[in-house]
Amino acid sequence: MLSDKFREYSLRKYAARRDCIAKSTANKISAYSGDMRTALEYLYGTLPLDDVRFTPFEWMEEACAAALETREGNQYGVDIPEDIFAQYVLCPRVNNERAQRHRRFFAEKLKARVQGKSIADAALSVNLWCCEQVTYHSSDDRTEGPITAYLSGIGRCGEESAFAVCALRSVGIPARQVYSPWWSHCDDNHAWVEVYTGDGWHYMGACEPEYELDRGWFMAASRRAMLVHSRAFSSYAADGLAGEELIEKRGEAYLFNQTARYADTVELNISVIRGNAAVCGAKVHIQLLNMAAYRDIAVLTTDGEGRAQLRCGKGSIHISIEHNGAYFERDIDTSICTEVMCKPGEFVQGYTSGIFRAPQSAPSNRTAADKAKQAEMKAATINAAALRERRINAYYDEFTASHKCSEVWLPYIRAARGNADEIGAFLLLQGEADMPYALKMLQTISEKDMRDTDAAALMYHMKRVLPNKHGMDDSLFINYVLCPHIGMEPICKWDEEGLSMLDANSAAVAKLRLSGMPARLSPATGAAEYMQNGRWMPLNAVPMGRLELAGDGLKQGESWALTRLKDGEYLPLNMGELPLCMDIPAGKYALMVTNRLPSGDQQYVANRFELAEGERLGFTLARPKAELSELLGHTALCDAIVYDKHGQAFPLASLCAGNAALIAFLQPGGEPTEHFLNELYDAYERLSAVCRVVIVLPSSGSSSLAYARFADKYGRIDTYIDADEVQEPLARAAFKEPGDYPLLFLMGGYPDCRFASAGYSVGSVELIIKLAALI
């Protein structure tokens, strides 16, 4: 079933790893022959070394056997190329999620769902099942495993997509996570799923079911992407993947370029020279301005002629190179310039300013939605949410019904969701004297830790660390000695194996805490620190300087950020809120202040400086000012229908004929909407003189004193009902947060949205009046 070419590739990769593989594991692999042995050699030869060292052999064995069964059975009747099978069915890893045994578990849950269906219909059915299990919930950057996602019922987009890919692969459907590391037009990123159906790759939103493939709310955003990539854990390519462009190898992962399948692209050609010689092996950081900092989307390596290429979107990028003590930085608008000559030299200090351009949206080839099928899917999604909540609530109900629980335990048992048995078991093991510290320890860990930490790991920390209290202040002891959470790692025992899985700084903190010394990672730099005489001291002393920053109305990570330049990459520091005074390591820095415009473009002021040991620097930050006309852009909204009080349907396009119209989705009774209504009450006559005002209320028919006062004063108002919840797709089309009221769209004729805002800001009605006068 597996080809000689694949056998040779797998054996070669496995042989190169033999020194890293335990003898007992190697013996188990050699006990197999044929395809099963080849599959095991492939996984042990290509997966990240932590998987090879720490994943139980039985998990790998199960993944191989299950994948080979799906290939032999070929229940969908689709010819799946061997390289696509190897990378996107056989491989149990999707990205950097926590490794968990899942293949048979998901396959058993899904086999009836996919029985007798085409591969495309099976993929849609699996995604609906995924929605029944998991929904979106923002959380920290650590990626939970697929079983944790299932037991929790929640995950951020990277976790939803990893979960969905694992589910799809478990029933033999080739699937991969597709990722835009950073958007250019808004401060965010996104991950979704692609499935291979025999006629190519097709996308879908993970745990966001649709009635057909190639639909998803994120498509408007992806058409403005600067980079979209997929990930695989081997370089094996035969018939299915031979044409895919490799961007870079990152650890054991290979990143492949998918941008041209979503957005308009150009080929960027970069040359790096020093003097008259080409620079070979230089790392070229391709960055976007996001969350007020330059952030990597790709790292290229120059070839023997000093050249590197990247197919990317049409907008601004930042190129950063640090090579052998020489530096190069430059903003490039790839819609204008695609050939860049880089000549590294001195680090240039001082202020620069400009506009960082977001790409325009590529044309859409999406067909009109089938309203009847959309309605069916909406009903299925509502049912999925009910099933999911019932299952998640049952974990809490079953544990509390079968165990005698103290009232103070209940918040922790509920927060644990599907991990209730483990958190409950930990609490049941505590004696009366230790219980207060057990509860306080649980208060120090994250929501995600609560959902995927086992009782044994928590008990380890209680037994090893609690005896070290020795009269230490409770707060210091609990947060910086007893706390088993350090950085982004899963909570584990800090034995030899556990420490080997931590990075150097986290391992240093763990060892200090085990010895009874209060320790942490520096909030600013991430370096290990310990407490001495009431002050946090760096474990490894480095030259330090002092930085003082001031500024009004600026939020870190939104309108300003401080980053340190290291090996060509700008690493953000968590500085806290302004004003501030902080000691930071001597080095080269960029202090950025940004102002994002409605078009997605950003005004920026960058201050590059070098901080010397013992030096004290101070800066006052100010947001760049935009001209009023710069607040107007062009964004195409999707078709949408609202209803009058009699139930008659009105397309928004029919309500926005003419030069200017304001569509205001409101939630009367909610504080942000109430503030907006108070402004509207005072300025409605001036507003209605420059644009038509269309007010859309939720189908729940909410009202308030502020809305009644406004309606009483102005009498007949264009008021409609959002019975179809069109605010969500409209908000996403304008790159705003759904459900963040008031949601305002200033139209220059439908579907041309010239300005949009979500949430209340002081003076929003006055701003709309001024902008409408310009349309």
Q: Where do the language-model regions lie?
A:
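Hydrophobic/aromatic-rich core segments of domains that either
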Residues: 108-128, 137-147, 152-248, 257, ...
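Short active-site neighborhood of thiol/selenol oxidoreductases, capturing the structured segment around
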Residues: 652-680, 693-695
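Short Pro-Gly-centered beta-turn/loop motif in secreted/extracellular proteins
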Residues: 305-325, 331-335, 412-415, 577-599, ...
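Thioredoxin-like thiol-disulfide oxidoreductase module
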Residues: 701-740
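Thiol/disulfide oxidoreductase modules built on the thioredoxin-like
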Residues: 724-770
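Structural motif
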Residues: 255-282, 289-291, 548-559, 565-567
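Short, acidic Ser/Thr/Gly-rich low-complexity loop/linker segments typical of extracellular
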Residues: 290-312, 566-580
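Secondary-structure boundary elements
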Residues: 2-152, 374-496
